[in-house]
UniProtKB/Swiss-Prot annotation:
UniProt-listed Enzyme Commission number(s): 3.4.25.2
Gene of this entry: hslV
GO biological process: proteolysis involved in protein catabolic process
Origin species: Staphylococcus saprophyticus subsp. saprophyticus (strain ATCC 15305 / DSM 20229 / NCIMB 8711 / NCTC 7292 / S-41)
Binding residue positions for Na(+): S165, C168, T171
Catalytic reaction list: ATP-dependent cleavage of peptide bonds with broad specificity
Activity regulation as described: Allosterically activated by HslU binding.
A GO CC term assigned to this protein in UniProt: proteasome core complex
Cross-referenced HAMAP family: HslV
Name listed for the protein in its UniProt record: ATP-dependent protease subunit HslV
Family listed: Belongs to the peptidase T1B family. HslV subfamily.
Length: 180
């Protein structure tokens, strides 16, 4: 049995001038054991002006949160600059390259995915998801954004994660939504 500890499924959306990020609460040990059902995978950073969520190794994610928050401070809350600088450091540092996690970071105007291979990705349609249930959440989110425009960003984030939790065994329905 694998002893790696993973946490999965984050979804972020900007809709009608509002931004929301949702994460489920499940932390899995290896492939078979649920260690925790109420983890908080979405955090507020930089005076509550930035949201960050992680999928992947829990310990690695905490390292990345800390490094990203340092970059935000260094670049006065400039989300894009902080994300690019983190990605460059992550890609260029031999020890950091070993980290197994991805981040979604967002403020009121931007959503970015930051990966350990140095990518900083801006989604085309103002929504993105990562983690084992990410594809399910992304599909649900796109359908909601196209066909349920009356929903708030927060409702879209919650419902997208709910769909993922119904399909993905590594995603539960203990959903936490943060809004900007």
């Amino acid at each position: 049995m694998s002893t790696s500890i993973h946490a999965t499924t984050i979804f972020a959306v900007q809709h009608n001038g509002h931004a929301a990020m949702a994460g489920d609460g499940q932390v899995t040990l290896g492939e078979q054991v649920i260690m925790k059902q109420t983890a908080r995978k979405v955090r507020r950073l930089y005076n509550d002006k930035v949201l960050a969520g992680f999928a992947g190794s829990v310990a690695d994610a905490f390292t990345l949160f800390e490094k990203f928050e340092t970059k935000l401070q260094q670049f006065s809350g400039n989300l894009e600059r902080a994300a690019v600088e983190l990605a460059q450091e992550w890609r260029g540092d031999k020890q950091l390259r070993q980290l197994e996690a991805m981040l979604i970071v967002m403020d009121e105007t931007s959503i970015l995915v930051v990966s350990g291979t140095g990518e900083v990705i801006v989604p085309d349609d103002n929504l993105i998801a990562i983690g084992s249930g990410g594809n399910y959440a992304l599909s649900a989110g796109r359908a909601l954004k196209r066909n349920a425009t009356h929903l708030s960003a927060s409702e879209m984030a919650y419902e997208s994660l709910k769909v993922a939790s119904d399909i993905c065994v590594f995603t539960n329905d203990r959903i936490i939504v943060e809004n900007l």
